Amino acid sequence: MDELAGQGHKIFLDAKLLDIETTVERATAAIAKSGAAFLTVHATDSKTLEAAVRGRGNAALKLLGVTVLTNLGPGDLKEQGIIEPAVALVPQRAQLAQDAGFDGVVSSGKEARALRERLGHDFLIVTPGIRPAGAEANDQTRAVTPKAAIEAGASYLVVGRPITRAEDPRGAAEKIVEEIESALGA
């Protein structure tokens, strides 16, 4: 990671940290020194989030709170003892992240519009589970198209399998870029 960051690459470390405060603080401090640009931390409680902020110190590392994984549906949340639907849980966790001093959150595009309205324009919304129009959702229960995510206010899109598992990855990526450019009016 140090080598890639040293070459000027922006590293998005999707570690999804969740542990006791001391461990999260120390891990975040080590990652901040590595030159990573982004780090994900589960936004389940304020103690964990505040520990990550302390660990970051004055580093340029952007902290992103993971609200609810995009593959989790109502049954999955209920299995964890969570009775609130994602549409209610995501804004609650995003608010915890913002209050703790995080730079943004990782959230489905289905909640992005409500988050943008609630948390403001400067708060980052990173949207995974992106599926181009007509693509299979795979294990993503709350997937959206690139266009829908952008129109809802997403700052960044995370696109994986629609490119990496495509017969023609370059062609798939180019189509997604076209869809993004169209949504941006470029």
Regions found by a protein language model. Name each.
Residues 1, 24, 137-139:
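Short, glycine/acidic-enriched capping/hinge loops at junctions between secondary-structure elements
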Residues 5-6, 113-120, 144, 178-181, ...:
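N-terminal amphipathic alpha-helix/helix-capping segment at the start of soluble metabolic enzymes
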Residues 49-55, 150, 163-186:
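C-terminal helical cap(s) of enzyme catalytic domains, especially alpha/beta-barrels
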Residues 16, 39, 97, 115, ...:
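Conserved, mostly hydrophobic/aromatic
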Residues 19, 23-104, 108-113, 118-122, ...:
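Conserved anion-binding
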Residues 34-46, 131-132, 140-172:
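Glycine-rich phosphate-binding active-site loops on the catalytic face of alpha/beta enzymes
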Residues 1-20, 157:
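Active-site cofactor/substrate anionic-group-binding motifs, chiefly glycine-
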